[in-house]
Regions:
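Histidine-anchored nucleotide/phosphate-binding helix
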Residues: 142-154
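A short, basic/flexible loop-to-alpha-helix module at the beginning of a structural domain
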Residues: 116-128
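Ferredoxin-reductase
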Residues: 7-110, 166-168, 195-196
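Hydrophobic/small residue at the entry helix of a nucleotide-binding pocket
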Residues: 138-143, 234
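Structural motif
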Residues: 130-132, 161, 225
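Short, conserved phosphate/pyrophosphate- and ester-handling motifs at nucleotide-, phospho-/glycolipid
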Residues: 51, 139, 231
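Reductase modules of NAD(P)H-dependent flavoproteins
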Residues: 163-268
Length: 268
């Protein structure tokens, strides 16, 4: 794959075969999360469908035959798909995470192999009257894509309710941006909860509970969709994880107990 900038209007089709894209900047978002900006032709836009993700690939040693091994991980950009010349990835860095450690070693000018897109939810304006979201940690990234698509479209009347769980107040990613969006858009409601609250914390305390879901999400119904994205423990508690073949899998957990059906829930 070439590291040269490709002069096209949309990178979408070219990404299918893969590109090496240069890291322009990196910033600390929290104690274990960093924001990376990757650049390409400034006249082009990424052009991904809403909530689609990209695959990133990095070398990871050699196999018994001396050939390079690779680690591959999906990430959802948090930047506007129509932004020209760049996209942003928010990466949580795990001590044993092979790909996240690779990202943590990047310096401006270094390149990352990117391929995709992988389409997730096929969002259409007004596809549901009310969308509820349950996110944990970096599980906020696909939610932000959907939220911004709804809010920037004056013809989209969808009501959005977000329950966002984190370990501590300092771990809440993109909180300032989310708060600004909620303050300026009455169709967006957000409830934060943390495991380890500070003395001045006024939001929820503990894991997302059945009571939080009842109070913060739209009721089950044909015009309701609940989106879920977070770490495995949260997924198990809320909805059950996806199947081994990455299909949606059986709906279990709190959402099933509250009467939601598989057609009302989408797991990222």
């Amino acid at each position: 794959m070439s590291s040269k900038m490709i002069r096209v209007q949309r990178l979408h089709s070219i990404l299918i075969s893969g590109l090496n894209l240069s890291c322009k900047t990196r910033h600390r978002s929290s104690h274990n999360t960093q924001l990376f900006r990757f650049q390409f032709d400034p006249s082009a836009k990424l052009g991904l469908d809403i909530a689609s993700c990209l695959l990133t690939r990095a070398p990871n040693g050699q196999n018994a035959e001396g050939k390079t091994k690779y680690v591959i991980r999906p990430y959802t950009p948090i930047s506007d798909p129509d932004a020209k010349g760049y996209f942003d990835l928010m990466i949580k860095v795990y001590p044993e995470g092979k790909m996240s450690q690779h990202f943590a070693s990047l310096k401006p000018g270094d390149v990352v192999e990117v391929k995709g897109p992988i389409e997730k939810l096929r969002y259409k304006p007004n596809m549901k009257k009310h969308i509820g979201m349950i996110a944990g940690g970096t599980g906020i990234t696909p939610m932000l894509q959907v939220i911004e698509a709804i809010l920037k479209n004056p013809d989209d009347n969808t009501q959005v309710s977000l329950l966002y769980a984190n370990v501590s107040p300092d771990d809440i990613l993109l909180k300032k941006k989310l708060d600004v969006l909620a303050a300026s858009h009455p169709n967006l409601k957000i409830f934060y909860t943390v495991d380890n609250p500070t003395n001045d914390w006024t939001g929820g305390k503990g894991y997302i509970s059945k009571d939080m879901a009842v109070k913060g999400l739209p009721e089950p119904g044909d015009d309701t969709l609940i989106l879920v994205c977070g770490p495995p423990g949260m997924m198990k508690q809320i909805s059950g994880d996806k199947a081994k073949d990455y299909s949606q899998g059986e709906l279990t957990g709190i959402l099933k107990e509250l009467g939601y059906t598989e057609s009302m829930v989408y797991k990222f």
